[in-house]
């Protein structure tokens, strides 16, 4: 019977997300960027664009054309 508790604990440890890896947060930020009419840039925005937010926790920027 105690083996079930051990197996449950190991399964739980493997399913817990790693700290600093915000998969759900990054997905929501990308979606919010696209809803606002932007795109996700890896390094910097193009000269005719402005930064309107972030696309991920790792520093990708959400850029949109200047109005």
Curated annotation (Swiss-Prot):
Leader peptide range in chain numbering: 1-22
Disulfide pairings: 33-62, 40-55, 45-63
One Pfam family named in its UniProt record: Defensin_beta
Keyword Disulfide bond: yes
Function summary: Exhibits antimicrobial activity against Gram-positive and Gram-negative bacteria.
Alphabetical keyword list: Antibiotic, Antimicrobial, Defensin, Disulfide bond, Secreted, Signal
Superkingdom of source: Eukaryota
MF terms in GO: CCR6 chemokine receptor binding; chemoattractant activity
PANTHER family: BETA-DEFENSIN, BETA-DEFENSIN 103
Main location: secreted
GO biological process, one term: cell chemotaxis
Compartmental location: Secreted
Gene assigned in the entry: DEFB103A
Identification of the protein by name: Beta-defensin 103A
GO CC annotations, alphabetized: extracellular space
Family: Belongs to the beta-defensin family.
């Amino acid at each position: 019977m105690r083996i079930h508790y051990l197996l449950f604990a190991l399964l739980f440890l493997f399913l817990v997300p790693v700290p600093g890896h915000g998969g759900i947060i990054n997905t929501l930020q990308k979606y919010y960027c696209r809803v606002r009419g932007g795109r996700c840039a890896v390094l910097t925005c193009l000269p005719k664009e402005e930064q309107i937010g972030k696309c991920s926790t790792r520093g990708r920027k959400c850029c949109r054309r200047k109005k």
